[in-house]
């Protein structure tokens, strides 16, 4: 299973939000580039980056930082946060990013998702962020009226190569992921699923390994707060 240590960038700094709330954020002293280097040095191969400035503006605000991370370290990087155009996807792919995550823009406009998957085969990940079974959009500030599983069934054949499922109620809480709902999503999804939100311990990683159609797991706040040591986490890697 793949493990994706997370870097969320806001104002050029590493931050973590609680339940996606920009007013409830923790800033960390280490820079995004140095944090990526730390992950690389410990033997991680994959990285999950969210441009939180991009999530708010719809622009590739931290593209230069992401480019620097790509060029300095041989990591497979997935990037999300406010990607709303083919142009933005191209910028990230040209920068060397492995997969670009489409969230709100894909939920609001299914044709955009379909076009992106056709234009960039194997490069598009679908990011579904849900609260109480319903998808959220626009940096989690808006709830859509769409049930996660209903939406997934509609777009399942569009060609996304990865699905990242986040339970917003768990994100940044370190209360363990919502394994039950993630399993429901993985059972429906045509592509492999990444678990996100609430990872608190190595036990969560071990539990994720036993689930079907799960490609990997994203770990964020538990690393920054020292609940999970990178030395322990890297032992769980097998991809």
Swiss-Prot record:
Pathway: Amino-acid biosynthesis; L-histidine biosynthesis; L-histidine from 5-phospho-alpha-D-ribose 1-diphosphate: step 4/9. The active site is at 8 (proton acceptor), 129 (proton donor). It is found in: Cytoplasm. One of its GO terms (biological process) is L-histidine biosynthetic process. Pfam families: His_biosynth. It catalyses: 1-(5-phospho-beta-D-ribosyl)-5-[(5-phospho-beta-D-ribosylamino)methylideneamino]imidazole-4-carboxamide = 5-[(5-phospho-1-deoxy-D-ribulos-1-ylimino)methylamino]-1-(5-phospho-beta-D-ribosyl)imidazole-4-carboxamide. GO terms for cellular component: cytoplasm. InterPro entries: Aldolase_TIM, His_biosynth, HisA_bact_arch, Isoase_HisA-like, Isoase_HisA-like_bact, RibuloseP-bd_barrel. It is an enzyme of class 5 (isomerase). PANTHER family: 1-(5-PHOSPHORIBOSYL)-5-[(5-PHOSPHORIBOSYLAMINO)METHYLIDENEAMINO] IMIDAZOLE-4-CARBOXAMIDE ISOMERASE. This is 1-(5-phosphoribosyl)-5-[(5-phosphoribosylamino)methylideneamino] imidazole-4-carboxamide isomerase. The gene is hisA.
């Amino acid at each position: 299973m793949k493990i994706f240590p997370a870097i969320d960038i806001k104002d050029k700094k590493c931050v973590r939000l609680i339940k996606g709330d920009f007013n409830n954020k923790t800033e960390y002293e280490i820079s995004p580039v140095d944090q990526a280097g730390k992950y690389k040095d410990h033997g991680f191969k994959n990285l999950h980056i969210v441009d939180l400035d991009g999530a708010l503006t719809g622009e590739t605000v931290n593209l230069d930082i992401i480019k620097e991370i790509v060029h300095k370290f041989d990591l497979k990087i997935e990037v999300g946060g406010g990607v709303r155009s083919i142009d933005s996807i191209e910028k990230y792919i040209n920068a060397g990013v492995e997969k670009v995550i489409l969230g709100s823009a894909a939920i609001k406009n299914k044709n955009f998702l379909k076009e992106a998957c056709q234009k960039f085969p194997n490069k598009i990940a679908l990011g579904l962020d849900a609260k109480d079974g319903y998808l959220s959009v626009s940096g989690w500030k808006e709830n859509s009226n769409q049930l996660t599983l209903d939406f997934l069934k509609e777009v399942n054949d569009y060609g996304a190569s990865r699905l990242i499922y986040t339970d917003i109620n768990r994100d940044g809480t370190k209360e363990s992921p919502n394994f039950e709902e993630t399993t429901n999503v993985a059972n429906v999804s045509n592509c492999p699923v990444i678990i996100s939100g609430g990872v608190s311990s190595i036990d969560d990683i071990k539990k994720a390994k036993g689930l079907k159609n799960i490609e990997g797991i994203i770990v964020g706040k538990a690393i920054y707060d020292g609940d999970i040591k990178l030395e322990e986490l890297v032992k769980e890697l097998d991809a």
